[in-house]
Amino acid sequence: MSFADKVLAVNDNLPIRTDLPVHSGKVRSVYWLTEQDSRRLIEEHNYPVPKDTPLAIMLISDRISAFDCIWRGEEGMQGVPGKGAALNAISNHWFGLFKEQGLADSHILDIPHPLVWIVQKARPIMIEAICRQYITGSMWRAYEKGEREFCGIRLEEGLSRDSKLANILITPSTKGVLKGIEGVPEADDVNVSRSDIAQHYAAFNFNSADDIALYEKLLTEGFGVISHALNKIDQIFVDTKFEFGYVKDVDGNDKLIYMDEVGTPDSSRIWDAKQYDQGNIVENSKEGFRQLLLNYFPDPDILLNKERMDEREALARNNALPVQVLMDISKTYTQIAEKITGQKIVLSDNPKEEVISVLRDRYQLID
């Protein structure tokens, strides 16, 4: 059996019982359960939610996306072996730590399989909640061009690339295209200031202006928990993206929670601390794959320029990367997951059949 067989690339075609279209994202697919199945699972498994809460199966794939495109390899390799299991394992670990330390809950109610979450429906805050501890990436590119204001924050003079910032900075961007907000362009992933959010908090889906401070508190506290834990294993938590939303608690009241994934190599930059101390940047995140792509293709502007999206999509569609590139990414993801969780990431021989078997036999969600 080849490594290509161990990859779950297509994750939106499982025969899970649902009466709504499957939502297929870049990496995860969401199957909304029927009202009857949601109620049954809540009762059978004593999930701490109102009995009428909509539930979903969230199934992660091994696909790898970068620069808003999905990339594939030669020899039929349609993803990265072990990537999905590594991402879920890392998120599960951090969500567990958050709960231990009295931070907010997540949307996850159950974990039937390393690739599967059972989640409750959440109403998302329309913000990519980005937290930065070092100046790198898009912030550095803007700074290098002479920009000194980033998301409404004034940056001091004399900063150097990849250096640690004096304070952790919150630099949010829009989640999706938001319309009709003065001063905010109608485009995806646009940087916004705290002032933008405060003036239009309802448009960003906050229940109240006070909840802006709550999301910032949960963001910085969550960042701190992960950063402290990574320091213990000689890793640096450089920057990250969190997502938040509202769910109903068991009494039917709204509560703000963490959602999607947290502190993973997909949503964060993680550097090797010993190498950083020696003046080297060694990525233990998807940023290493992004840098490889920028160096691999002769015209990196295609990957960075949003106005060349058609060319970028053609580049991803028409170019199969060497298998070794994807295997190196697999090693990065599985090794950092094992360091963080202390548990080995085991590759399934047939992940799709495993998931079907669990959801059919233990949860009766497949006829």
From Swiss-Prot:
Molecular functions (GO terms): ATP binding; phosphoribosylaminoimidazolesuccinocarboxamide synthase activity
The organism's place on the tree of life at top rank: Bacteria
UniProt keyword Ligase, yes or no: yes
Pathway(s) of this molecule: Purine metabolism; IMP biosynthesis via de novo pathway; 5-amino-1-(5-phospho-D-ribosyl)imidazole-4-carboxamide from 5-amino-1-(5-phospho-D-ribosyl)imidazole-4-carboxylate: step 1/2
GO cellular component: cytoplasm
Pfam families attached to this UniProt entry: SAICAR_synt (PF01259)
Keyword Kinase: no
Catalytic reaction list: 5-amino-1-(5-phospho-D-ribosyl)imidazole-4-carboxylate + L-aspartate + ATP = (2S)-2-[5-amino-1-(5-phospho-beta-D-ribosyl)imidazole-4-carboxamido]succinate + ADP + phosphate + 2 H(+)
Keywords, ordered alphabetically: ATP-binding, Ligase, Nucleotide-binding, Purine biosynthesis
Gene Ontology terms: biological process: 'de novo' IMP biosynthetic process
Coiled-coil region(s): none
EC annotation from Swiss-Prot or TrEMBL: 6.3.2.6
Family: Belongs to the SAICAR synthetase family.
NCBIfam families on file: PRK13960.1, purC_vibrio
Protein name as catalogued: Phosphoribosylaminoimidazole-succinocarboxamide synthase
